[in-house]
């Protein structure tokens, strides 16, 4: 059984074996949680961008990520918190508009990261609210989609035991709890 828990905290310090980065398709890590993770992992975000782009070319053979594809990079300085991997995924850009196409792209982004965690053999994985920040998707819809995808993923899960949705602000944490 895969347990899903919504928690308040800083994903860069959250003690899961893998954390997910809500990245843009070029792994630029220029703002939001992507910048915070890059800075915490490498000290210099530009260095983590270089490492991420190199990993993307090695793992995918191209210079961008599609919805559902993921890239794994080392946790580097995050290892002191028990984090072993950073899994980069790309959610949809909503700009405040939510529809079935956006939901399907988010489902692919979440499922891609979960399947990669399974492949890596990790027991715990922590996600930020992918696409709910800078990308402007409604938080409540993002949370509901997370819950649905995790319920479906449970049928294929082997090593993954716990999935966390980590919200940084108290307000978002409370909104997320009300959504499920």
UniProtKB/Swiss-Prot annotation:
Q: Per the database record, which ranges form the Macro domain?
A: 1-180
InterPro entries xref list: Macro_dom, Macro_dom-like
**Can you say what this protein is called?**
Uncharacterized protein TK1890
Which regions form coiled coils?
none
The scientific name of the source species is: Thermococcus kodakarensis (strain ATCC BAA-918 / JCM 12380 / KOD1)
Give the matching Pfam families.
Macro (PF01661)
């Amino acid at each position: 059984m895969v347990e899903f828990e919504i928690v308040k905290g800083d994903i860069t310090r959250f003690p899961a074996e893998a954390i997910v980065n809500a990245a843009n398709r070029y792994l630029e890590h220029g703002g939001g949680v992507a910048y915070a993770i890059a800075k915490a992992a490498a000290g210099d975000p530009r260095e983590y961008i270089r490492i991420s782009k190199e990993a993307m070319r090695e793992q995918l053979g191209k210079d961008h990520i599609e919805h559902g594809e993921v890239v794994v990079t080392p946790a580097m300085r995050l290892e002191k918190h028990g984090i072993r991997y950073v899994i980069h995924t790309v959610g949809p850009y909503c700009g405040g508009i939510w529809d079935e196409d956006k939901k399907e792209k988010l489902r692919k982004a979440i499922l891609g990261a979960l399947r990669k965690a399974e492949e890596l053999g990790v027991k715990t994985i922590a996600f930020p609210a992918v696409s709910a920040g800078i990308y402007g998707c409604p938080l409540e819809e993002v949370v509901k989609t997370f819950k649905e995808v995790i319920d479906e993923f449970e049928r294929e899960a082997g090593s993954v035991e716990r999935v966390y949705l980590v919200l940084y602000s108290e307000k978002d944490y409370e909104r997320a709890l009300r959504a499920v």
